[in-house]
């Protein structure tokens, strides 16, 4: 399967909450970036340059299994991720600048997208008629 690249919109969730509660008149920091769809990865992984533009606060350190072995990675405060008309809040794991932004399995599951390997694109889950749906069983 070839690489599937998507354009994602990211908004600093803390900024968004503060703005929506009218505690700040400053618009939330937002960026649009390309991300590689990576179902073999777990979470949402962003480059340091993207994290800096969003002004995200470091919250923790996590262990991560990578193609180069185990690594310690920084975890950051949440972003609102928007993709193809769907949106949800996700925490962020930092990857080195030379690694692409990665959209892993958890965001794909929550947003209910799957990779169409034949078409080399991301699509709404056909098991749910292409519409976003949660499963509770």
Role assignments for model-derived ranges:
Residues 1-137:
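Pepsin/retropepsin-fold aspartyl endopeptidases
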């Amino acid at each position: 399967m070839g690489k599937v690249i998507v354009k994602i919109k990211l908004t600093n969730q803390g900024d968004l909450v503060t703005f929506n509660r009218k505690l700040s008149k400053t618009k939330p920091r937002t960026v649009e970036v390309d991300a590689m769809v990576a179902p073999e990865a777990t979470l949402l992984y962003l480059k340091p340059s993207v994290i800096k533009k969003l002004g995200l606060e470091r919250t923790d350190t996590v262990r991560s299994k990578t193609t180069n072995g185990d690594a310690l990675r920084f975890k950051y405060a949440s972003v609102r991720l928007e993709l193809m008309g769907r949106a949800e809040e996700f925490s962020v794991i930092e990857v080195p600048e030379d690694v692409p932004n990665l959209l892993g399995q958890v965001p794909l599951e929550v947003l209910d997208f799957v990779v169409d390997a034949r078409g080399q694109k991301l699509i709404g889950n056909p098991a749910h008629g292409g519409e976003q749906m949660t499963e509770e069983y």
